[in-house]
Amino acid sequence: MPKIIKLKDGAILLYHKNTQSKATAFRVGMLRGGYLDKNTGLSHLFEHMLFKGTTNWSNEELTALIRDNFSNLNASTSGDYMIIRSYESKKKIKQAFKISSDMLLNSTFDKEELEKEKQVVRQEIIRANDDIQRIASHNLNIMAYNYPELKSKTLGDEKKMMAITQKQMLKHREDNLVRENFIASVCSNLPACTIKKYINEYFVNHLKSGKKNTFDSCNFTINGKSGMVVETMDRQKVVMKVAIPCNGYLDMKKSFLLSRVLSYTSGVKGPLFDHFREKKQLVYSIALRRNTNKHDGLLFFDIETSTDKVNECFYAIKDFMDEVKQGIAQKDVARLLEKYEENDDRFVGHPVDFCSGLMFDYLDYGRIVKDKEFKRLKKYVTKENLDATILEVFNPDKIFISVAGPVNKKDIMPLSKIERLIIG
């Protein structure tokens, strides 16, 4: 049974019993990420420097320790968090916790190593600034949610990142790696009491109490008005993100039904494929995706097309929505139920998946979603419920459009015309 274990001063341990193997998957770190970095990339650079030596081990010694004691070790930074993650055998888990703890708590951020690592991150920023999909997604989010913090990219601005000092790194840890922001997510065959003991021993007991980060991107609400942003770039293709509002994660029934609707519309030879590929050959690729949080979210058409077919794609979206609003056939309902059973039978659950799932459940819902909640939801997969979900989602009152590639805004139909076409 997954559980949330509250530790001292608000530190959080998320635990799931691993019944599949004797391995332990864990994520440890802080609920403080790039959204609050003011586009400096400080959190991300901090993550990189965790591997560059501590007060106890030099860079070379730490590298050797990691090589000898970890089968899998990495770290990651998002807008909301910075964590170390690993997947280890039962025999090595204490040593894995010990080394991870030293990396978090005692990294020196050596000045010479810091300057070297900045060059590594600089290359990441250059690649990201050349990634048309990433640019279109970023522009969509900051327009649709209209929160200033979203403008802060996790990698940061190159010039600002290059100016970060050792002193800033140390202060970042001092201010943010506190008990109130600490989180650990663990899937292990070891009992919860043992994992709790290790987390306290190697992490929480060494942290001070401090100021809790109250910023939560999962609480964002959608902008009240439609919008469109176009970024002209010299590329071979155009990327379009055309989004409409959809419900967030808190309503489990609605969220589950929406996932079934997406399975129906986006399948091979389904309505989405039919309108964009079979009938008119409009796109290089097409998908219908979700981007949701606790309260609000987006359902967006993820399109790659050519410059001359951008406007035609809006008409295809209109035709697609008109078709699906006619309702789902009973044979497709039966197919969805059959597919659900097949997926359920195939799923075993890797400890790494459980570990990450626990953390995302906690961030998205503020709690852990139990397996039986999803199993109970299967009974809601009926034609009546699916039709109601389709009508709710595909009758939007606003639309958000992000376009990037070899196209100018003046060549795209006006937003007001797109609104009349798709919203009515």
Specify the residue positions occupied by each region the protein language model found.
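Charge-rich, well-structured scaffold segments of protease-associated domains
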Residues: 6, 59-214, 249, 278-424
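Active-site SXXK
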Residues: 41-54
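N- or domain-start disorder-to-order transition segments that initiate the globular core
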Residues: 1-23
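A residue-level signal for beta-strand positions that form part of recognition/binding surfaces
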Residues: 10, 25, 81, 227, ...
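Residues embedded in well-ordered beta-strands
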Residues: 12, 25-29, 183, 241, ...
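Short N-terminal binding/cap micro-motifs at the start of the first secondary-structure element
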Residues: 13, 23, 36-38, 411
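Short pre-active-site segment immediately N-terminal to the catalytic Zn-binding motif
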Residues: 30-40
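His/Glu-based metal-binding/catalytic segments typifying zinc-dependent metallopeptidases
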Residues: 16-32, 210-275, 423-424
